[in-house]
Structure formats: C-alpha cells, structure tokens
UniProtKB/Swiss-Prot annotation:
Protein name as catalogued: Imidazole glycerol phosphate synthase subunit HisF
Task of the protein: IGPS catalyzes the conversion of PRFAR and glutamine to IGP, AICAR and glutamate. The HisF subunit catalyzes the cyclization activity that produces IGP and AICAR from PRFAR using the ammonia provided by the HisH subunit.
InterPro entries associated with the record: Aldolase_TIM (IPR013785), His_biosynth (IPR006062), HisF (IPR004651), IGPS_HisA/HisF (IPR050064), RibuloseP-bd_barrel (IPR011060)
Pathway(s) per entry: Amino-acid biosynthesis; L-histidine biosynthesis; L-histidine from 5-phospho-alpha-D-ribose 1-diphosphate: step 5/9
C-alpha cells in the first residue's frame, strides 16, 4: 500500500505566509522558506506554496521566492497562484518547482491542462479546486478567483474532466471548512475520490491530528494538506506521522539517530 502524504500548505501574500478563516481575515505568519525548512526537518512529504491573491489581483508569483525554496528544500515543491499560461508553467518549473498547481486559468481555458501535461508530463500538473456545498445541499459548486467567484461548474463533473485532460493530481479544498478547524469535508472528498482515478489531496478544515487520521480512514484521499495546525505550533509533522502509524495508516518516517 502506498504511504499517505503529509503536506504543509503555505498560503502566501506579498511574500509572507498568511492564514485566515473561509479565505478572509488573513493574518501574517512568517517567511515561507524558513517555515518550509522546518517542516522538511519534521518529515513532511511535500510542500505547497500558494499565492492566494495572485489570480485575483493578476500579479505574478515572485520567482525569487520559488528559486530560494527550491534550492533549500530536498522534498517536492508545488507552486500555484496566478498561473495563466503554458509559459507560467515553464517559468515556475525552470525555477525549480516540481509541480505546478493551476486553478482559475484551468477553468477559463481547460486545454491548458492538456497542453501542460503533454509538454511537462502529468506528474507536474496539479489542478486545485475550491468547492462549496450548494444551498440545497445537493452537490458542490466550484469557485475561482481565490474563492470569490462561482464558476458555475459541478465539482464532480469538473474533477472528472480534469482527469480526462491530463491532470496528474487534484488538490481539493472545502471552502466551507477552510480555516475552521472542524475536520475535513469527508462527503465532498468521497464524492471526488470515487469519481476519479488520480490522486486526491484533501484540504480545508484540519484542526487536530485526529482529523488527519479520520480523513485517511474514511476516504480514499492520497494526501492531507493543512496549514493552521502547523503554523501555530499546535502539532508537528512528526507527531502526525506517529499517530498515523499507530492507527495502521502507512506513512513515510525517518529514523533519527540517537547519540
């Protein structure tokens, strides 16, 4: 059985890590590269950098930040935010990122997914999807522009289309759960995990270690992504991995040498 991945997510605004509740009320946390290095030391499997305002304000991701992170990290780095073209993919990968996450532009131009997969390989293409439960509780709507605009797409339909176009992975965020620390949206995750055959990364709502255990025990999610739990020092990646192992959930661990 493949090991489950633990992925700290660093939401970046103006070059600093921030975190808010339901995509608003942002507060600054710290330097993204320094935080990423700490998480790698704690046995994180990957790191995600998301420029959460780039798409809305039409700003480009700061290349220097990506390059610095890529030089100082040995684990995979995914970068997203403000991705609009195949040139953006090319530029970010050239800076040293391992994967590129695309959200708004993939909906506006779905062929971008196919083009990127053909040129760089499906392993480099992550489609980030922000979704919110409909008022009638019958399914989920997809949102773009940092969660500010309803894209008019059904979540499951869009996820399946992303897979057909060549996405190698889906990063699925529950807008209802994001920042609330009330646990992942298991229903939403199950809807998508059963509809596609590519890896799904669970995001939005993690507040305690047991939430991570729960998402792996109750969904087919391949990875869990979270921010608040780590950024505020409420838990470490090591502690999460230990709890997964205790619950017979496969996870990568590094045996530390004893003096």
């Amino acid at each position: 059985m493949l090991t489950k991945r633990i992925i700290p997510c660093l939401d970046i605004k103006n070059g600093k890590v921030v975190k808010g509740i339901n995509f608003v009320g942002l507060r600054e946390i710290g330097d993204p590269v320094e935080l990423a290095k700490i998480y790698e030391e704690q046995c994180a499997d990957e790191i995600v950098f998301l420029d959460i305002t780039a798409s809305f304000e039409e700003r480009e991701i700061i290349g220097e930040l990506i390059g610095r992170a890529a030089r100082e990290l040995s684990i995979p780095l995914t970068v997203g935010g403000g991705i609009r073209s195949i040139d953006d993919f090319r530029r970010i990968l050239a800076r040293g990122a391992d994967k590129v996450s695309v959200n708004s532009a993939a909906i506006e131009n779905p062929e971008l997914i196919r083009q990127a997969a053909n040129e760089f390989g499906v392993q480099c293409v992550v489609v980030a999807i922000d979704a919110k439960k409909r008022a009638d509780h019958r399914g989920y709507d997809v949102y773009i522009k940092g969660g500010r605009e309803n894209a008019g797409l059904d979540l499951v339909d869009w996820a399946k289309k992303c897979e057909r176009l060549g996405a190698g992975e889906i990063l699925l965020t529950s807008m209802d759960k994001d920042g609330t620390k009330t646990g992942y949206d298991l229903e939403m995750l199950n809807d998508v995990c059963t509809a596609v055959n590519i890896p799904v990364v669970a995001s939005g709502g993690c507040g305690k270690i047991s939430d991570i255990v729960e998402v792996f025990q109750n969904t087919r999610s391949d990875a869990a992504l979270f921010a608040s739990l780590f950024h505020y020092g409420e838990a470490t990646v090591d502690e999460v991995k230990d709890e997964l192992i205790k619950n017979n959930i496969p996870a990568r661990i590094i045996k530390k040498e004893t003096l």
